[in-house]
């Protein structure tokens, strides 16, 4: 296993030990093939939200909203944006002085690869070591960028830290959307960063009741 490893204990009704990778490889660059750029006739594309339907009973995804970070013919991946934990980032990285006065907590990004850490960053400008997903939202797995954001007293960027991700194989998400497990909606920075996590799913469901995204 590459990189330094830090043991993190998340309180989720029971104490769960997670090993979070501190140094991670850069995320795979987004595909630039014509097929990938076109997205899906179901409205699926990088930068969309997939919102769990009321009937989705899988405990991993019930009442969740997943922000798609990658979508192509080989599958899809994203992070759940409305499952925060009560674990402060200062507890996860006790040696990072810049975190000690901050209130941010770790978020559960999904059930896949729970050792993987993903950063979502809100910024109106390009960021080194990050990829723009949609306007004002960038994604990174760079510890260097994370340290810069934490240590800058004048930083205007917001960020969230996610452990794990949601992943689908080729055609899997399309089938789940087609049978009604998920609704597809556009994403925006306000939903990801400003809406209280407990309000994300009901708010999106109300929006979707008016008009689900259709292509």
Regions found by a protein language model. Name each.
Residues 5-215:
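A short aromatic-anchored loop/beta-hairpin motif
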């Amino acid at each position: 296993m590459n990189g330094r490893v830090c043991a993190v204990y998340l309180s989720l009704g029971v104490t769960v030990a997670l090993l979070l990778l501190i140094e991670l490889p850069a995320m795979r660059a987004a595909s630039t093939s014509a097929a990938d750029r076109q997205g899906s006739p179901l409205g699926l594309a990088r930068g969309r939200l997939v919102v769990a339907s009321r009937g989705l009973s899988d405990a991993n995804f019930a009442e969740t909203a997943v922000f798609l970070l990658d979508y192509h013919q080989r599958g899809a991946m994203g992070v759940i944006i409305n499952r925060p934990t009560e674990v402060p980032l200062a507890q996860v990285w006790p040696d990072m002085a810049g975190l000690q006065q901050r209130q941010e907590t770790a978020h559960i990004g999904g059930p896949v690869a729970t050792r993987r850490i993903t950063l979502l960053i809100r910024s109106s400008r390009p960021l080194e070591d990050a990829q723009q997903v949609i306007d004002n939202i960038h994604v990174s797995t760079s510890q260097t960028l994370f340290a810069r954001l934490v240590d800058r007293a004048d930083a205007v960027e917001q960020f969230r830290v996610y452990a794990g991700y949601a992943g689908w194989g080729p055609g899997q998400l399309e089938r789940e959307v087609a049978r009604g497990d998920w609704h597809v909606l556009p994403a925006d920075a306000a939903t990801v960063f400003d809406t209280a996590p407990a309000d994300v799913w009901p708010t999106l469901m109300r929006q979707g009741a008016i008009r689900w995204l259709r292509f």
